[in-house]
Amino acid sequence: DEQHSVIRAALLHDIGQLRLPRELIGKNDLNEEEKRVLDNMQAEGFRILDQVYTGDTSVKRICAQCYRCIRDFQDGKRPDLRISTEARVMAVAQTYDQMTAMQFGQNPASEVMAIKHLLDHPEVYDANAVQALIDSIHILAPGTSVELNNKEKALVLTLNPENVLRPVVLNFRDNSIIDLGLRGNRELEIIDIMKTMDNRHVMDTEALKRQGFQVEEPKYVEVPPG
């Protein structure tokens, strides 16, 4: 069925690149000759899929449509979105995976930057597929530590249903609460997710309560003198 076809396509879409020259692996800025080599490798992969899935063209079709959609966008062309839903879903998943995965010679993009890229190009990446990805990975769930573009560190307090990248956050430096969804804060944005929690901050629980947030305070134990 369609779901199985998407799964197979996701696993096999780059099978043709197994023979890709080492110097082209992970390279983004390709010249025309290198693009031709990559196209030939992909075409060989599609021929392999034809041989493996005799009589079933769905896997090859999804892979080919996804490849052409992303490739046209990279070449500055407007992709033809008259492609299958499965190919649209895979284009979103593949782009997110490629941007956030470890790559030889360069650092991966943050999850935030990858989602921002997908949201910024609705002419390429299907909005429903992008939203499904956001819903599945819970990228900025409450409790997530983040870095802002002003170098400040903050903690996500509540989600923004209108824009997942602009939640309400708590600034670690001064315990101020910042609603990134407000127009007055439009110059601030999250640029990365912190992988480790900074335990050096002190949270002002009273300030949170005044803003209407429910705070579970730790139980303190009195230590007898002496």
Predicted regions, residues:
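Histidine- and acidic-residue-rich, metal-dependent catalytic cores
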Residues: 1-226
